[in-house]
């Protein structure tokens, strides 16, 4: 059995684009959670740096993550996000070391 693929996506909004980025990210949550390979999808905003968002993500495997990236709603977000992001999205993959 494969270990889940767990990651944090770090997204920093351009000045004046914080709300647009937040709304775009919030719009991804419901359809992503309905994907058969999704295990976790939760959005956070950094307290001391408003406009910096972290999406905690877990998918059952690489194929499930690839399927997520190919969805029409993620593709729409990715196309729009270029205008909202101050720097390229950073995707940090994590390895669980405790229960």
Predicted stretch roles:
Residues 27, 31-39, 58-92:
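An amphipathic, aromatic/His-enriched active-site/gating alpha helix that lines ligand/cofactor pockets
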Residues 5-12, 42-69:
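Short, well-ordered beta-strand segments in beta-rich or mixed alpha/beta enzyme
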Residues 5-35, 39:
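N-terminal first-folded block
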